[in-house]
Amino acid sequence: MSLLRVTRSSGHLSAVCRLPARSISTTSILLVPSNEGNKPPTPMIDLEDKSLPIPIYKEKKNEPLQLQKSRLLYQSRKRGMLENGLLLSTFAAKHLESMDVKQTKLYDQLINMPTNDWDIFYWATGVKPTPAEYDNEIMALLKDHVKNANREKRICQPNLY
């Protein structure tokens, strides 16, 4: 049972939400390097919420390749988090059309099988090691894309047409 308490002081509203201890469990703590001079690394805490099961992704059977690529383009753009939206939409704009059937299937699995979008981001940026089932030619292409050797501006998603 959670508790929500709202209070008003000097014209401002504040809310306190107390969650049960079982709803949040810490699985690991990583240190993320700081980009600001001599500051020490900041801790990054991974949280797993076991109370909300995410349905297992079911691959679409007999989906035409062009329809699959259209779906993947949409899914690359609509991630629900800005970081992956920018990385995956620019990656898809650059590589998706030239992918063959096998590569398209690998990309489909990469963006739809993991239950946490932050995992995809951390694998692509090298913060966490990539699990064996996703460590393939598409992940290598994505990691190369993330390095941005040509220093392309990626502040918004590319136009569709």
From Swiss-Prot:
Keywords: Chaperone, Mitochondrion, Transit peptide. Residues 1-31 form a transit peptide. GO terms for biological process: mitochondrial electron transport, succinate to ubiquinone; mitochondrial respiratory chain complex II assembly; protein-FAD linkage; tricarboxylic acid cycle. InterPro entries: SDH, SDH_sf, SDHAF2. It is found in: Mitochondrion matrix. Signal peptide: none annotated. One of its GO terms (cellular component) is mitochondrial matrix. Belongs to the SDHAF2 family. Interacts with the flavoprotein subunit within the SDH catalytic dimer. Plays an essential role in the assembly of succinate dehydrogenase (SDH), an enzyme complex (also referred to as respiratory complex II) that is a component of both the tricarboxylic acid (TCA) cycle and the mitochondrial electron transport chain, and which couples the oxidation of succinate to fumarate with the reduction of ubiquinone (coenzyme Q) to ubiquinol. Required for flavinylation (covalent attachment of FAD) of the flavoprotein subunit of the SDH catalytic dimer. PANTHER family: PROTEIN EMI5 HOMOLOG, MITOCHONDRIAL, SUCCINATE DEHYDROGENASE ASSEMBLY FACTOR 2, MITOCHONDRIAL. This is Succinate dehydrogenase assembly factor 2, mitochondrial. It comes from Aedes aegypti.
